[in-house]
């Protein structure tokens, strides 16, 4: 890899680490181009992304940004999934892992100031996403309004 290519890759990695709040670092073995294509496509629909990284350059970027505690996780064939919604990308990766048993293994996740283990990532995958929570709240509100109105009208009728 030429020095100019390394500098470009380094700036891309630094840009990802500074732009996005959440990262999941995963190891991949035996993934073919179609696997990456389908995973990237799903992530893109969720306003997220995936980047295969060069370990040594990632360590340099992390050191520059003061996140050296993550450097130990960069060994082997690594990719980073980045987003502003960790639950959504956790769900996508968990689904991909379920469909493709031995192709990826989660190493850790990074949440602004904290390193999260792979079990925590899988726990996040079991939680409802922000959009699903909004839908649940709206359905509870829209269900309760007519019931409360009926109870109020009934109470008024009983009062008179």
From Swiss-Prot:
GO terms for cellular component: ribonucleoprotein complex; ribosome. Pfam families: Ribosomal_L10 (PF00466). SUPFAM superfamilies: Ribosomal protein L10-like. One of its GO terms (biological process) is translation. Keywords: Ribonucleoprotein, Ribosomal protein, RNA-binding, rRNA-binding. GO terms for molecular function: large ribosomal subunit rRNA binding. Part of the ribosomal stalk of the 50S ribosomal subunit. The N-terminus interacts with L11 and the large rRNA to form the base of the stalk. The C-terminus forms an elongated spine to which L12 dimers bind in a sequential fashion forming a multimeric L10(L12)X complex. Belongs to the universal ribosomal protein uL10 family. HAMAP family: Ribosomal_uL10. NCBIfam families: PRK00099.1-1. Forms part of the ribosomal stalk, playing a central role in the interaction of the ribosome with GTP-bound translation factors. This is Large ribosomal subunit protein uL10. It comes from Ehrlichia canis (strain Jake). The gene is rplJ.
């Amino acid at each position: 890899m030429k020095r100019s290519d390394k500098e470009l890759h380094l700036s891309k990695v630094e840009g990802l680490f500074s732009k996005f709040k959440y990262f999941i670092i995963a190891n991949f073995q035996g993934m073919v181009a179609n696997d990456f294509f389908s995973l990237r496509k799903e992530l893109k629909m969720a306003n997220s992304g995936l980047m295969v990284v060069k370990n040594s350059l990632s360590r340099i970027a992390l050191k520059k940004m003061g996140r050296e505690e993550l450097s130990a996780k960069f060994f082997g064939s690594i990719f980073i999934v980045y987003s502003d919604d960790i639950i959504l990308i956790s769900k996508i990766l968990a689904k991909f892992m379920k469909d493709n048993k031995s192709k990826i293994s989660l190493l850790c996740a990074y949440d602004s100031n904290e390193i999260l283990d792979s079990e925590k990532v899988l726990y996040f995958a079991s939680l409802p996403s922000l959009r699903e929570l909004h839908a649940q709240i709206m359905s509870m509100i829209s269900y309760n309004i007519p019931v409360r109105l009926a109870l109020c009208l009934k109470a008024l009728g009983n009062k008179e």
